[in-house]
């Protein structure tokens, strides 16, 4: 319940622009947000493994 209210709160335009923070649009996670992909690291990893994110490959050496 608290997570849903935080997601709704993050979608609203804040009173001051510095109060705005990034949140994953898929799962609502506030931490480990990657601006380049606009999602959290966990969602990015899941989508990259399924091949839904172009240009991302699993590294191996």
UniProtKB/Swiss-Prot annotation:
Q: Does the keyword Ribonucleoprotein apply?
A: yes
Cofactors per UniProt?
Zn(2+)
Q: Which GO terms describe its molecular function?
A: rRNA binding; structural constituent of ribosome; zinc ion binding
Swiss-Prot/TrEMBL keywords: Metal-binding, Ribonucleoprotein, Ribosomal protein, RNA-binding, rRNA-binding, Zinc
Q: Where are the transmembrane segments?
A: none
How many cofactors are bound and how?
Binds 1 zinc ion per subunit.
Q: Does the keyword Manganese apply?
A: no
List the record's Gene Ontology CC terms alphabetically: cytoplasm; small ribosomal subunit
InterPro entries given for it?
Answer: Ribosomal_uS14, Ribosomal_uS14_bact, Ribosomal_uS14_CS, Ribosomal_uS14_sf
**Where does the signal peptide begin and end?**
none
What Pfam families does the record tag this protein with?
Answer: Ribosomal_S14
- HAMAP family referenced in this protein's UniProt entry, alphabetically: Ribosomal_uS14_2_B
Q: Which PANTHER family match?
A: 30S RIBOSOMAL PROTEIN S14 (PTHR19836), SMALL RIBOSOMAL SUBUNIT PROTEIN US14M (PTHR19836:SF19)
Q: Which family does it belong to?
A: Belongs to the universal ribosomal protein uS14 family. Zinc-binding uS14 subfamily.
Role, per record: Binds 16S rRNA, required for the assembly of 30S particles and may also be responsible for determining the conformation of the 16S rRNA at the A site.
Could you tell me which NCBIfam families the record lists for this protein? PRK08061.1
Q: What is this protein called?
A: Small ribosomal subunit protein uS14B
Q: Which gene encodes it?
A: rpsZ
């Amino acid at each position: 319940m608290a997570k849903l209210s935080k997601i709704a709160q993050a979608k609203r335009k804040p009173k001051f622009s510095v109060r705005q923070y990034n949140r994953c649009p898929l799962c609502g996670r506030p931490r480990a947000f990657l601006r380049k992909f606009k999602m959290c690291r966990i969602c990015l990893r899941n989508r990259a493994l399924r091949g839904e994110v172009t240009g991302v490959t699993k590294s191996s050496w």
